[in-house]
């Protein structure tokens, strides 16, 4: 396993992190015992960055991490997010959300608490509500670091500029066919010593043969995906998962990304991605070619 430093927190974290959406039944039913096996397999392989959220399975993902981490809590860097979708981003709701997460996770502290889905609130509401609550929770020792999560980079930038945020998690913005984090956004995260977490380097499944169910009828999106894939066909390897390895290696070896998240519902899927975490990735010239090919071209809105 390869490790990196999570920005200004100074913590050493695995370059490959385990995302908790799949084991929270977000993409289909995963038996509880199977979820435990996935979590234990991750820890046994040296993965110490575990990512979940109150929203995933309406708390089920957190509950499963809580069960699986009995006796192993000190081995991992445990992260979650607040608040649940559809609830306000105010101070009281945030406090209640984090307290509920602590109970489900069966722990008395969270290593990293993150504002979830920043696009669904406003900067002022979040700063006076969620972020204010996070800062008080940090003073109380219930959280150790504070982050923000979202897909719209322009929404995330003002939070980074406050100086009160330690990490930023975004998704589908640093992948083979959408490189929009490259350039100004990475310059901003470097300037503020952000720990950058990259979610969904496979684009919610569009870099595989099985896009996420909620994308399978978006014909315009899938047509654009096919067009972009054709432009990088030389990277595709034989077999049904031809873009998976180059996509994972592209993210795992980016100097500006501390952690790349993988969602796994079965241990075998996790092991496949662990095999790519050996420090081998595209050359500087190959990376530059990708950045030039899709510069400024967002795939997802």
Spans of model-derived segments:
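Structural motif
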Residues: 41, 45, 104-105, 141, ...
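Beta/alpha (TIM)-barrel catalytic core signal, keyed to glycine-rich beta->alpha loops juxtaposed to Asp/Glu
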Residues: 118-301
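Structural preference for beta-strand elements that scaffold enzyme active sites
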Residues: 13-17, 48-49, 75-81, 109-114, ...
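Distinct, well-ordered alpha-helical segments
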Residues: 61-70, 90-102, 106, 123-131, ...
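Conserved, mostly hydrophobic/aromatic
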Residues: 6, 18, 35, 50, ...
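Acidic-and-aromatic substrate-binding clefts and catalytic sites of carbohydrate-active enzymes
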Residues: 28-29, 53-62, 85-90, 121-124, ...
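N-terminal binding-site loop/beta-alpha segment at the start of enzyme catalytic domains
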Residues: 1-76
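Structural motif corresponding to the early beta-alpha repeats
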Residues: 56, 71, 75-92, 117
């Amino acid at each position: 396993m390869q490790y990196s430093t999570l920005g200004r927190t100074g913590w050493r974290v695995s370059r490959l992190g385990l995302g908790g959406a799949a084991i929270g039944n977000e993409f289909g039913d995963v038996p509880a015992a199977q979820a435990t096996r996935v979590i234990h397999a991750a820890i046994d392989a040296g993965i110490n960055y575990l990512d979940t959220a109150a929203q995933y399975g309406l708390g089920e993902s957190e509950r499963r991490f809580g069960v699986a981490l009995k006796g192993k809590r000190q081995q991992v860097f445990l992260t979650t997010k607040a608040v649940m979708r559809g609830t306000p981003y105010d101070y009281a709701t945030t406090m209640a959300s984090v307290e509920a997460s602590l109970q489900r996770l069966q722990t008395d502290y969270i290593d990293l608490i993150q504002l979830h889905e920043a696009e669904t609130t406003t900067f002022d509401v979040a700063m006076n509500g969620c972020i204010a609550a996070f800062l008080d929770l940090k003073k109380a020792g219930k959280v150790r670091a504070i982050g923000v999560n979202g897909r719209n980079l322009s929404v995330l930038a003002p939070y980074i500029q406050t100086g009160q945020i330690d990490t930023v998690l975004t998704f589908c913005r640093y992948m083979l066919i959408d490189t929009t984090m490259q350039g100004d956004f990475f310059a901003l995260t470097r300037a503020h010593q952000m720990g950058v977490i990259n979610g969904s380097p496979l684009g919610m499944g569009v870099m595989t043969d099985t896009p996420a169910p909620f994308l399978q009828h978006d014909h315009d999106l899938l047509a654009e995906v096919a067009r972009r894939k054709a432009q990088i066909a030389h990277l595709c390897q034989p077999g049904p998962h031809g873009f998976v390895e180059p996509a994972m290696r592209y993210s795992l070896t980016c100097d500006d990304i501390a952690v790349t998240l993988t969602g796994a519902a079965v241990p075998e899927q996790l092991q496949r991605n662990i095999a790519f975490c050996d420090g081998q990735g595209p050359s500087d010239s190959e990376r530059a070619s990708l950045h030039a090919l899709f510069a400024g071209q967002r795939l997802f809105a």
